[in-house]
A protein has these predicted regions:
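Class I S-adenosyl-L-methionine-dependent methyltransferase module
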Residues: 1-50
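Adenosine-cofactor binding site in Rossmann-like domains, unifying the SAM/SAH pocket
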Residues: 47-66
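A short acidic, Gly/Pro-enriched loop at the edge of an enzyme's catalytic core
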Residues: 64-76
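Hydrophobic adenine-recognition pocket in adenosine-nucleotide-binding enzymes
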Residues: 80
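A short glycine-rich, Lys/Arg-flanked "PGG" loop and its adjoining helix->strand segment in the class I
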Residues: 88-104
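Conserved beta-strand signature within the Rossmann-like core of class I S-adenosyl-L-methionine
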Residues: 101-114
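Short, aromatic/basic amphipathic alpha-helical patches
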Residues: 116-124
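Core SAM-dependent methyltransferase catalytic element
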Residues: 129-152
Length: 152
């Protein structure tokens, strides 16, 4: 919705080429998965092979249907708003405003430069350094922005 019509193929091509030109691109597990179909290291994502059992419950469905959003410390939204109208984003912002002070929302955006803080700013502040850091260090390569909003 927010990217230019017909722009996704060239967008992805440019992101992959940029990733290939980075130092140690051969170690990037996302590029390995694209070109090899597997990860060269069993430890590509250390949290997946942790000796400590991570008990993370799976939640499937709309975030708006969670009865206990206030109990979450972090909500991570990947590409959710890339295809959403401002009305839908405003609905989510109001709902997520139930989160406790200091909790965070991570918003990842593909082919989209809209800064959603304009809609969230009644409830959240943005850590702009977070986005700058991940624009430089994100190994997945595809995101234009990884924004961090912190509940006021």
């Amino acid at each position: 919705k927010h990217g230019s019509p017909g722009s996704y193929i060239s967008y992805m091509k440019n992101k992959i080429l940029t990733g290939l030109n980075k130092k140690d691109s051969h170690l990037n597990p996302f590029l390995q998965h694209i070109f090899l179909g597997y990860y060269q290291s069993d430890n590509a994502f250390p949290y997946m092979t942790s000796k400590n059992k991570l008990d993370i419950p799976m939640t499937e469905g709309s975030i708006l249907n969670l009865d206990n959003i206030y109990s979450y410390d972090v909500v991570s939204l990947s590409n959710i708003f890339d295809w959403s109208s401002d009305t839908i984003v405003k609905t989510h912002a109001r709902y997520l405003s139930q989160m406790k002070k200091g909790s965070s929302i991570i918003i990842r955006q593909i082919n989209n430069h809209k800064n959603w803080i304009e809609i969230f700013n009644d409830y959240f502040t943005e850590d702009k350094n977070f986005d700058s850091y991940w624009q430089e260090h994100d190994r997945s390569m595809f995101y234009d922005h990884i924004r961090l909003f912190i509940r006021k």
